[in-house]
């Protein structure tokens, strides 16, 4: 994009539309309002007028669940958006129909819009409490990434830019499955050694998948990969970790999901990653065991045994 044509300073007040009023969408709205921006939040269930919310928006942030991405994209397509509006995806998941990331779905419908991925170790409850956090905004359009960086950064929320949107997006998505595995480990009370092994080998698994799909391996060592993985695997605030912990304690998946507010995206990401891995010949043993466990086709103990008894190899 021609940046000079925008005439918009990164520090100028912006008009920000946020799609999704869940925990993350509400947190992003709080961050944007704290920086003096004009913020409008749209929630399908509240019957708000989408056209009114989008009118004049310079930054449009999608913070809906993965299941809501396609319906929201279609709703936005019907209404239309300002031609220079920056589309930001803050969703972590994979589409089970076409095996696409959220940004790929947005890009297919709005190929002319600048696209940005926002991801990182961002437990929304901590951010709402005013605790410090950092994240990454990634785009093939450097100007768009900088616009979003300055729009949301504050003394308590630091944003870095990246030119690898696919890597940033996949890091935030793939780690949800590994977090379930780590939760199972803790639910079984297997100790710090086992947890460290799962996190480390889980990161290697994420890198294998991401690299095969075209992301840069080094991206996964940053905030959106390792950073998000560590936060998600070491906090009871993480829905995915809580799913795994409950399974490790012997609770039925249906009961666990009923007790969790919001969506544990890793539950729905696991089968998609298994399918992608099968298509591309990628080894994802941890994800495979998580998938079997979620489907009720194995037990936590049996899954652990299979992982430990895999053929010995180099790291």
Curated annotation (Swiss-Prot):
It is found in: Cytoplasm. It comes from the Bacteria. It is an enzyme of class 1 (oxidoreductase). It catalyses: sn-glycerol 3-phosphate + NAD(+) = dihydroxyacetone phosphate + NADH + H(+); sn-glycerol 3-phosphate + NADP(+) = dihydroxyacetone phosphate + NADPH + H(+). NADPH binds at residues 24, 44-45, 92, 124, 239, 265. GO terms for molecular function: glycerol-3-phosphate dehydrogenase [NAD(P)+] activity; NAD binding. It holds the Pfam family NAD_Gly3P_dh_C. Sn-glycerol 3-phosphate binds at residues 92, 120, 175, 228, 238-240. Its EC number is 1.1.1.94. NCBIfam families: PRK00094.1-2, PRK00094.1-4, PRK14619.1. Catalyzes the reduction of the glycolytic intermediate dihydroxyacetone phosphate (DHAP) to sn-glycerol 3-phosphate (G3P), the key precursor for phospholipid synthesis. This is Glycerol-3-phosphate dehydrogenase [NAD(P)+]. It comes from Synechococcus sp. (strain JA-2-3B'a(2-13)) (Cyanobacteria bacterium Yellowstone B-Prime).
